[in-house]
Amino acid sequence: MRGCGNFLASPVLRKLEKGLEQIIMKHITDFHTHAFADRIYERAMQALKEGSGIEPFHNGSLAGLLESMDQAGIWRSVVLSIATKPEHADVILDWSLSIASERIIPFGSVMPTDRNAARDVRRMAAAGIKGLKIHPYYQRFYMDDPALDPFYEAVTETELVLVSHTGYDVAYPEREDLATPERTARVINRHPDLHLVAAHFGGWEDWDAVERYLLGKPVWLETSFLAEMCDRERARRMFLAHDPARLVFGSDSPWVGQKEELARLRGLDLPAELMEAVLEKNAASLLGNEAGIT
């Protein structure tokens, strides 16, 4: 067609392409990312890099995360922080409230073992935070410890989403059994209405136990590392064995590239309806589609 080349290079077509990209981006949520405040991200990332031996994919700042999201075609990210002392809860809450936006969904964090944990959970919910992050290794607790039941009950009552690290942890080579799939199963058995999202598909490098204790159970599984660390057929089988309404995409950015993790997920050749649920619908059902603070 005469003049077609000029049209393909025209500002009108570029605008149409940009609009299509925005439509695509608007639906994908990354349920597992990390970022730090501008005044501490360099120091925090250096310490974490030394502890894990992993080279990050961006600098750990909020700007770095947003740039990564743009490159990957991701519209929203859940930003997860971890309180390693009770007093960190307020600092994390204040920062979370300051960064929340249509594209950034910050979760709070409390020390589950602290005597005021249940009170802090209710305070987070009252402030409009949509969820919390806990990490049995960094916060030093067994996930199924009955002493944590008041904490889990408060999370359930406030209808917050709870993301927990599950499985082993690369920074702890001694492989303590703090967050095994079996322990996670005990938590959901005691608290069946808890909106628990088990990071790393329910058990980083403990995939046999994930299949034994968690697949098909009432727990949300976040997808990071499964497609990278398992062979393709096993990863695909595990996806298909779980409730399709309880799977959410996560990358663990900046320790994994968001674009790369999306490519690995797409490489599993999952049914289109399941992919839509994992990337879009299930996160929307947990978080809603509005901005990051309610």
Could you say what each language-model-derived stretch is?
Residues A9-V12, E17:
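Acidic, Ala/Val/Gly-enriched low-complexity intrinsically disordered segments
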